[in-house]
Amino acid sequence: MYRIVATASALIAAARAQQVCSLNTETKPALTWSKCTSSGCSDVKGSVVIDANWRWTHQTSGSTNCYTGNKWDTSICTDGKTCAEKCCLDGADYSGTYGITSSGNQLSLGFVTNGPYSKNIGSRTYLMENENTYQMFQLLGNEFTFDVDVSGIGCGLNGAPHFVSMDEDGGKAKYSGNKAGAKYGTGYCDAQCPRDVKFINGVANSEGWKPSDSDVNAGVGNLGTCCPEMDIWEANSISTAFTPHPCTKLTQHSCTGDSCGGTYSSDRYGGTCDADGCDFNAYRQGNKTFYGPGSNFNIDTTKKMTVVTQFHKGSNGRLSEITRLYVQNGKVIANSESKIAGNPGSSLTSDFCSKQKSVFGDIDDFSKKGGWNGMSDALSAPMVLVMSLWHDHHSNMLWLDSTYPTDSTKVGSQRGSCATTSGKPSDLERDVPNSKVSFSNIKFGPIGSTYKSDGTTPNPPASSSTTGSSTPTNPPAGSVDQWGQCGGQNYSGPTTCKSPFTCKKINDFYSQCQ
């Protein structure tokens, strides 16, 4: 992933500070999600908070901006520490300013929102456990499931639920200069070690700040903020990918200048994190009819779909495989098989990642930054759920949905059917401002607990459930209908398919009646 996220603009410029002010009321959108066990799922009442980078930042003594457009006010922010002391984050109008709405278990993110004081571009949000802490997820041995509607986001846009190893309180306890914490969306980090984050480790990133040439709201400072990242879903209606990114350090940590590596530095591989990751993109793996708009694709992106991502443990208790399933129109659909010679498979494994780097001729920074073992450690630890919608000032999202590099003819360079001239941020803001993405019906629990083999939702248990051991939900006794599960490791249900269907092995963990 090559993430540079768009931010808000104009009179109330988005910026991240560490103090708190209350000129605007902060009312977070409620969002219900489900925690599952083998006996069913129960609702959890949560909420979402917008990242502090989008918020109005002004002097604690009044309403004078500390950051306007893509520049700091150097008369206030003479250095990073002083800036954090003098500037505050304020409350957010989620729907009116940022185009963020929720209803029950659905969260919708709008692309361009013309608010009362500003024009906002995209957003980044986090799931909250309570008013002051993020909801934490330990993915290893479990599965994460959600419904998504990508019909409203095309070439150049990315609706992206992903997990990162942020601090539960947004760094408030760790860094004395951070008085805002998770309540105001502080503490972001990812495997790009982003340097556009305006406050890092409780100080302003104002020193060495260079305003962007193309983004009127953003820039790059001396500091970056790094941590492992699991991209569950980076997607639009044309392409999708899921990608683990390990780091040599398991928790949030800062970096300086080009030693950060990633998108924001001249030495992409000079940091502590794997900026490229090991991705599974069906189009890049040679299947150009698996995912896309229309009934001729296995997954029709004009319709809502359920996305299931499973993090399997091996016999040694470590990460062995990351698998993907889809549910659409009541059918469970196995992930696409790679058609690339020398790089077979339909899931991510250590072997798949090694072969992919070799066959595609990519730099294997994945292995250098911890590889499969490093990712196992990250997925064993608590991570924060991020849900965002963004466009890309660095490479126009071509790495996701087009040919990238644009002049390349080598295997692996084709990632989607979008034109190499597509995805320019200014074009998107002008031509498709009403684009939006919706995420709903989020479920988390042991493998097999968040969906049924017939595509239906598990029944709720009699009482509240908590995350337990990895035990699949057993389907009813008898023979299995078409598209139902009929085998796999730890599966104890029926293995006979109804006539005329037969049980076909998809991978070690899943067989399906076809």
From Swiss-Prot:
The active site is at 229 (nucleophile), 234 (proton donor). Residues 1-17 form the signal peptide. It comes from the Eukaryota. One of its GO terms (molecular function) is cellulose binding. Its EC number is 3.2.1.91. Disulfide bonds join 486-503, 497-513. It is an enzyme of class 3 (hydrolase). Keywords: Carbohydrate metabolism, Cellulose degradation, Disulfide bond, Glycoprotein, Glycosidase, Hydrolase, Polysaccharide degradation, Signal. Residues 18-439 are annotated as: Catalytic. GO terms for biological process: cellulose catabolic process. InterPro entries: CBD_sf (IPR035971), Cellulose-bd_dom_fun (IPR000254), ConA-like_dom_sf (IPR013320), Glyco_hydro_7 (IPR001722), Glyco_hydro_7_sf (IPR037019). Residues 462-479 have a biased composition (Low complexity). Glycans are attached at residues 287, 490. Residues 408-433, 448-485 are annotated as: Disordered. Residues 478-514 form the CBM1 domain. GO terms for cellular component: extracellular region. Residues 408-424 have a biased composition (Polar residues). It catalyses: Hydrolysis of (1->4)-beta-D-glucosidic linkages in cellulose and cellotetraose, releasing cellobiose from the non-reducing ends of the chains. Residues 440-482 are annotated as: Linker. Belongs to the glycosyl hydrolase 7 (cellulase C) family. This is Putative exoglucanase type C.
